[in-house]
Amino acid sequence: PYQAEVAQTDAEYKRSRCGRKTKLNDKLRQIILNHLRLSWSPGMIAHEFKLATKSIYNWLNQGKIEFSLNDLPEHGVHQRRNLDQRSKYNQSLGRSIEQRPIVVNRRNRIGDFELDTIVGPRGHSKAVLLNLIDRKSRFLWAYRLKNRTAVTVNEALNKFLATFNGPVHSFTVDRGTEFSGLVSLEAQYGIKTYYCHAYTPAERGSNERFNRNSRYFYPKGTYFEHISAQGLKTTLLEINQRPLKILDWQTPYQVMLTNLSKNSD
């Protein structure tokens, strides 16, 4: 498998480097290119291989690494999603994000989740991905849904709640009709839901960033009916095992595991 080959190449490079001054040779060029193709950012690569982030950008700008800057995970301005399904009555749905407590805003604990859906080709595909990301650890879950209705979303969330062995305190969502049924989960589980202001994806910043990165695995136009359960599992494994600067270069998996262990003590 491609990722296994990448891991083997990484290990060989780290053993051979042994404190030497970094020069861009063929082996290092291929390592950087491999990870860029896996949607790693230059910062992630620099930390993992003890390089200077600026050096990677310089090599890219100079054409020494053949990879377009436009294809970097965080490059450019993210366009607003078409919110055609946000009906006027949804503007008064539920509890506003303005009421979200400080402990959630500061990401002090696991169990506060941002939710969103990623759609396939409009008018041609009903299946979507439901994404849940823990605000503290940035750990991501995703479910393939047959459609984008509130009933189907609630079914997936009930499945998540039955299998996740950690705390679930809150959901933060946009005002899409697919999230209009979360009030029933609050009554059943005591999970509070906070609705963002209309047209403000930045209020779910973690989820929006992971949605952008997920497009590496599932480009626009993907028919989610055609993705396999194993394929989705592999994608989540790859995303959750990437070291993140915001986590002091730990992975979401490491942070989630550490916090779950603390909760079980």
Regions found by a protein language model. Name each.
Residues 1-35, 48:
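Short, basic alpha-helical/linker "hinge" immediately adjacent to a nucleic-acid-recognition surface
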Residues 3-6, 51-107:
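Basic, flexible linker segments flanking DNA-binding modules
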Residues 30, 34-38, 48, 162, ...:
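Charged alpha-helix within mobile-element recombinases
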Residues 31-59, 64:
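Extended, domain-scale alpha-helical bundle/helix-rich regions
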Residues 32, 45, 56, 116, ...:
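Mobile genetic element proteins and their domesticated derivatives, centered on retroelements
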Residues 101-140:
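An active-site-proximal beta-strand-loop segment
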Residues 119-121, 125, 142-165:
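Active-site beta-loop-alpha junctions of metal-dependent nucleic acid enzymes
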Residues 166-181, 199:
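Acidic/histidine-rich, metal-coordinating catalytic segments
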